[in-house]
């Protein structure tokens, strides 16, 4: 294995540890991982009383919020 390959392997192994360390603030990696976990199709819309309501269970399980895009008429997971 090349030196570059070994360096990449070590960095990948240390990445989870780096996200756990710190002063309790969210790291940029947390936001990235949350964005990757959020599925645009996860919060399916339901119609109640003629209004479109986005279900929030799946988004909330990943720490995100379910939103409704009026222009595109669909629900989506929004991660802070």
From Swiss-Prot:
Signal peptide annotation: 1-20
Listed GO CC annotations: extracellular region
GO molecular function ontology, one term from the record: toxin activity
Keywords: Disulfide bond, Neurotoxin, Secreted, Signal, Toxin
Tissue specificity statement from the Swiss-Prot or TrEMBL entry: Expressed by the venom duct.
Modification after translation (UniProt): Contains 4 disulfide bonds.
Subcellular location per the Swiss-Prot or TrEMBL entry: Secreted
Presence of keyword Transport: no
Maturation-removed propeptide residues: 21-36
UniProt domain comment: The cysteine framework is XXII (C-C-C-C-C-C-C-C).
Record protein name field: Conotoxin Cl10.1
Organism: Californiconus californicus
Lineage of origin: Eukaryota, Metazoa, Spiralia, Lophotrochozoa, Mollusca
């Amino acid at each position: 294995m090349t030196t570059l390959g070994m360096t990449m392997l070590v960095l990948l192994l240390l990445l989870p540890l780096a996200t756990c360390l710190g002063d309790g603030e969210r790291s940029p990696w947390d936001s990235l991982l949350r964005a990757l976990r959020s599925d645009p199709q996860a919060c399916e819309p339901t119609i109640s009383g003629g209004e479109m309501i986005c279900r929030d269970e799946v988004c909330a399980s990943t720490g995100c919020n379910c939103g409704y895009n009026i222009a595109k008429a669909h629900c989506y997971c929004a991660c802070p």
